[in-house]
Amino acid sequence: MLKLARPFIPPLSRNNAISSGIVLTSRRFQSSFTFLSNQSLLSKNQMKSKRKKGSKKAAYHRQPPEHEHTAPLIKQNKTITKKEHSDVRGSHLKKKRSDFSWLPRVPSTSHLKQSDMTTNVLYSGYRPLFINPNDPKLKEDTGSTLYEFAMKLEDLNEPLSPWISSATGLEFFSEWENIPSELLKNLKPFHPPKEKSMNTNELIHVSAKRNTLVDNKTSETLQRKMDEFSKRRGKGRKKSVVTLLQMKKKLEG
C-alpha cells in the first residue's frame, strides 16, 4: 500500500474549517465617537465662534472721532425731516379732501367683465372703440390718413337700406334676408303726391262737370222707370205719374 503525504479530508469537513477560519479572522470595526462626543473638535469649534464674535464687535465699536461727534446730529436731523415730511403730507392730504356727497350714487359695476362688454359692443353694430396704431398695415405709408380710414369703416357699417334694421342697429329683421342687395339699394321710401291747388276757373269747370254727370244719371234712372211703367200700364191702382214725380223729387233732394 502507498502512504499518502497528507491525510484525506472529506469535502464537508473542509468547508466547515474554511468557514470557521473566516469567522475567526473577519472582525467589524466601528468608531466609538461622533462629532458631538469628541471634546477636542467641540473646543476648536467654540474657539472659532468666539473669534468671529470678537471681530464683529470690534468692527462695530471702531468708529472715527469725527463720526462719533456727527452721529447724534445726523440722527436729530433725520427725526426732524421725518416730522416735517409727515406734517407736509398731512397738510397735503387735508387740502385734497373734498365733499362728493352731492354726486349721485350708482350701483357697483364690479360684476361686469371687460370681455363681455367688448363682445356686446362688437356685435351691436357700433364702430370699434379704438384702432390699434401698432398694426403694420396702418404703419405703411399709403397716402391715407386715420380720418379717411375711419370714414371707410363708417361706410362699411352703414346698412343697405334704412328699414333692414332698427334705428339703433341692434336688431335686424329676418324678412329682408332673401331680398337681393341690388333691389335693396334701389328701394326708396314712399312719398305721397302733393295736392295741386286749383284756380277758380278750374274749380267751376270741375263742379259743372260733376253736375252734368249727376243730371245724366238722374235722367237715365227716370227714363228707365218710365219704360217700366209703360210696360205694365193698367195694373194697380196707383197712377204712374205720381210715382214718377215722387221719384224725381227724391233724386233731386
From Swiss-Prot:
Biological process annotations from GO: aerobic respiration
Record localization: Mitochondrion
Endpoints of the signal sequence: none
Compositional bias segments (type: Basic and acidic residues): 81-90
InterPro entries: Pet20-like
Annotated function: Required for respiratory growth, stability of the mitochondrial genome and for proper assembly or maintenance of mitochondrial proteins.
Protein name: Protein PET20, mitochondrial
Species this protein is from: Saccharomyces cerevisiae (strain ATCC 204508 / S288c)
Gene: PET20
